[in-house]
Amino acid sequence: MKRVSFVIFFMTIAAVVYGQEPAPAMLPLTLPDGKTLQVEVARTEETRALGLMFRTALTEDRGMLFIFEQPGLHRFWMKNTLIPLDMVWMDDRKRIIHIEYQVPPCKLDPCAVYGPSADSLYVLEVISGVASREQLRVGQTLTF
């Protein structure tokens, strides 16, 4: 009986641990003024596709950094995104090449698509207002 209880206990723990989503990778990202944000890293196709969808809140010291394998015309939409965002595109040197300020959630299809006309390798999403408040500008470099 003890052995059966132990096996059931072990299997229950294994099922709980196995079924949990891994915590997102967090990375400090430093803005040109020295302020540091903690950003979730979206490095895989799956995490990039999900992005910040279905989030109901995002604090000003948090964000999501999308990292792509290759530079390209990486465009974003706000489908299923519930909070307004600022989006910051960067090239392979982490230099800002384009900013979209105060992008609203998409309420009706088709959703607008946002992005630069030049290739980017990284995109930072933060809660709406952060890019203006931190005076982010094209040509500045972010550190991460």
Residue ranges and their predicted role:
Residues 4-5, 50:
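Small/flexible residues
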Residues 5-15:
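Bacterial N-terminal signal peptides
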Residues 20-144:
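Compact, glycine-rich, soluble single-domain proteins
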